[in-house]
Amino acid sequence: MISALTGDSIAEYGGRREFTVRKAGMHDIAPILDLINAYAAKGIMLPRTEFEVSEDIRDFLVILADGRMVGCGALHFYTPSIGEIRSLAVAEEHKTHGIGRRLIESLVAEAAGFALHAVFAFTYVPGFFSKMGFQEVERGELPLKAWKDCLRCPKFQCCDEIAVLRVLDSAYCRDFQHHDPEHSGLVQLPVVGIK
């Protein structure tokens, strides 16, 4: 598990470059915003403000290469049993180097350390998450609170992101399969069509 006080160093590219995963601090806000908002400008992620990242900075992990931030991701709690992996961004020049995978592994380890039963994400790349043990689920099966960010998204009425879920506790998996909101922390939302 990632310690809030010490980083987790990993060697990538055959040992040529040192990567460090650590909890984000206030000094990381500007580079986090740069990463996230570069993708937001392409319509791939929701834009974030300095206030939002400041408010949620404890949710974030960052990954550094040669002292420079090359990736970030956050674990946001919704219920005592489920959290969302969000704001996952990797610098363009560092894609396909395992940074996204390492961030997901670190965030999942952090979720397990908090005894969460499951984590979910909204994504355009479900294949990547599938390789990390996530399964596609219906959006309406996720916690109602997860939709608060969706309300400000320009694609809210015609969302094309895929919901994915990774179960960390097999007992939770049984509850999830039976769609029992009382035990699973999930809420079934009705499907509303636009006319």
What is the role of each PLM region?
Residues 117, 123-157:
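Conserved active-site alpha-helix within GNAT-family acetyltransferase domains
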Residues 47-59, 65, 71-82, 86-88:
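A conserved beta-strand-loop-helix scaffold within acyl/acetyltransferase catalytic domains
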Residues 96-111, 121:
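Conserved acetyl-CoA-binding loop-helix of GNAT-fold acetyltransferases
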Residues 58-60, 158-165:
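Short hydrophobic/aromatic beta-strand or adjacent loop that forms the aromatic wall/cage
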Residues 20, 113-119:
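Short active-site oxyanion
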Residues 88-95, 124-125:
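A short, internal acetyl-CoA/4′-phosphopantetheine-binding micro-motif in the GNAT/acyltransferase core
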Residues 5-47, 64, 161-163, 170-195:
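Short amphipathic alpha-helix that is part of the acyltransferase structural core
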